[in-house]
């Protein structure tokens, strides 16, 4: 009996084992199929990384690059800028400007719909009208919203929907740059129903009109957008955009880890140049290293970003108050060598004023080339005028630009200027810079819109911080009068002459030390096509394709 019982037990165990093996085989097969399916569809998903969390997907808060990149996939405005920064129609199919750039009439397309969402009730969506733009623009000025972009409406007197398809905008004063400004993400159209439905949570439940629509967001982990199958734009062959099925964003804070993900094919591109990997991927002359030439495309273009040191002019410091010493600092270091060795050639030495290359108003004005002899002469002049034989300055910066500040420190000490460097977190640097607490600060200015006026606004005396971007508190009556006149001139060539004069005034008085005009740099997987590059470093994914 015991033998029979044992035999039955063994027989049962064998059957159980067989069933178990079959289950394992089925599961592994299904898993393999799922993996194969994911692999087959991976070419339909564009993946990139952000180093810090996106704070909001509400375009009213599209203040910095990470928010702008994300919202650029979800929303549209009246106009858009192409890669050459030319103004093109977006939801507005045409426009008329009357009264010397004081009144605008925009005629809208009639085939644009908001993303499907429960906020619209049983219809799930509806057509965009001029009233939506009226609501969206006026929302920027609502103190309850507290949009950091409220300033873009400061010169707007009235926004009114004439009817469903015509929007009128009346300016307080002539402002020729306004049409280009409308390409900013702040000026996106949003539906009132969705803003009311989600309230403060609209920031993480965005509803727009863009080529992609919101799918899910696990903050600081991942963010996913899906294709908007009803998007209104088509390519030149009439194919509906976008080509991709989805966009996936990760949030790795470490740039070296991001680079590793890129080399492993887990993300599709990286933007910018970081010290942690720059020598690994490019040569000292700014070319791709040989090992990456078959898998990576390097794209560069002048970036509308000027990197600089700023002097806070409203101070009693005799070093800061001395034009001679400020000029000596400008002459006292070699920008060409700095860009070549610290940026691997990725940048343009800022020896021609503050306005960067690529903007109307940029001209090869005489700036500050490296001239240590001239710097010593100006330093001697400073000593004679002040009796101070040991000038000392302190530069506030964050760690990302420490190498550049240390280079300037070494070069200036060679000519007799003692330099200390105060390294602080980026948030502290921004706060102290805005509060006038730093005698000298490292900063950058990226164009909000493609007009040189945007850079010159940093020196207009009505724009002192915290009410504007004049962080240096520089004031010059001649500059101010030219700035006001330029706002009334619609012809860009006529404005350009005034811009050049203003840039020359700033250069001569040296409230800033321009370091370099930046380059937009992108390393893109060879599997990706259709990803352009532009001087504002916008991320436009609607025409991107990926190979298997």
Residue ranges and their predicted role:
Residues 175-242, 246, 256-257, 373-377:
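Gly/Pro-rich hinge or "lid" segments in bacterial periplasmic/extracellular proteins
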Residues 212, 348-382, 401-403:
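Structural transition elements
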Residues 96, 132, 145-192, 213-218:
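Surface-exposed binding/hinge segments that line
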Residues 339, 420-429, 457-525, 548:
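Extracytoplasmic/peripheral linker and loop segments enriched in polar/acidic and small residues
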Residues 348, 380-447, 520:
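Ligand/substrate-recognition segments at binding pockets and active sites
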Residues 49-99, 138, 207:
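N-terminal lobe/hinge region of extracytoplasmic solute-binding protein
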Residues 129-134, 210-211, 241-246, 264, ...:
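Alpha-helical secondary-structure segments
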